[in-house]
């Protein structure tokens, strides 16, 4: 089991779902500092309390942040290094969903400009701004093991004639990650991607707005050959990539859960 003792981490989208599971697991692995950012502060207190129960020695700092703002992302990362003196790893989990089954064929004609821009702005631009800011601060730190993990999706592998903005944003996230990985590896920074399959998070119902219940969504995906996984399973892969146990892996896009071939 990799230890994160004395290490500092930054997590976007860290207040719920996969991001929160990653924060909790980092604390269980004895991380010194977890700086999480999320567009909503609703879950900050409850997450801090749950982490304090599992590991009171882990410092958790919460920031309300919209990853669509490059300037605010830069300021957040710079403040982490200024306050805590280091940044060993980061996971960029922030993202938004797009509902399926809402558009008539040909679905491309109902993919409107506003939704396209909104989803790409968070799921792609947000990852770009965050990764760039993380590399910017990491490259000036003393030599050491540093790792960045971006979260894409099963949609990066599939070719569904719907939810164009979401699928495109996640495919682009995976491509961007691979390119950055090749660019910064020689600077001592490993960059990888995780592509979760169907995962039981608060965002799951947003992908299937016509479904009557969460169980109905799970049954539908199971019938298609896609069992529903849990956020903790994705978090274990993210934390492994953030740890020294995953050296020398870089530029990978790891599927977690069921995925099309």
UniProtKB/Swiss-Prot annotation:
Checking CDD domains in the record gives: SDR_c
**Signal peptide positions on this chain:** 1-20
Does Transmembrane appear among the keywords?
no
Q: Which UniProt keywords apply?
A: Alkaloid metabolism, Glycoprotein, NADP, Oxidoreductase, Signal
Q: Where does NADP(+) bind?
A: 18, 66, 132, 166, 170, 201
Under which main EC class is this enzyme filed?
Answer: oxidoreductase
Please list the reactions this protein catalyses.
Answer: chanoclavine-I + NAD(+) = chanoclavine-I aldehyde + NADH + H(+)
Pathway recorded for this protein = Alkaloid biosynthesis; ergot alkaloid biosynthesis
Active site positions, chain numbering: 166 (proton donor), 170 (lowers pka of active site tyr)
- UniProt GO MF annotations: oxidoreductase activity
A Gene Ontology biological process noted in the UniProt record is: indole alkaloid biosynthetic process
Question: What is the superkingdom listed in this entry's lineage?
Answer: Eukaryota
Give the E.C. number(s).
1.1.1.332
Sugar-bearing residues? 43
Q: Which Gene3D superfamilies match?
A: NAD(P)-binding Rossmann-like Domain
Subunit description: Homotetramer.
Described purpose of this protein according to its UniProt entry:
Chanoclavine-I dehydrogenase; part of the gene cluster that mediates the biosynthesis of fungal ergot alkaloid. DmaW catalyzes the first step of ergot alkaloid biosynthesis by condensing dimethylallyl diphosphate (DMAP) and tryptophan to form 4-dimethylallyl-L-tryptophan. The second step is catalyzed by the methyltransferase easF that methylates 4-dimethylallyl-L-tryptophan in the presence of S-adenosyl-L-methionine, resulting in the formation of 4-dimethylallyl-L-abrine.
Q: Which family does it belong to?
A: Belongs to the short-chain dehydrogenases/reductases (SDR) family.
What is this protein identified as? Chanoclavine-I dehydrogenase easD
Q: Which organism is it from?
A: Claviceps purpurea (Ergot fungus)
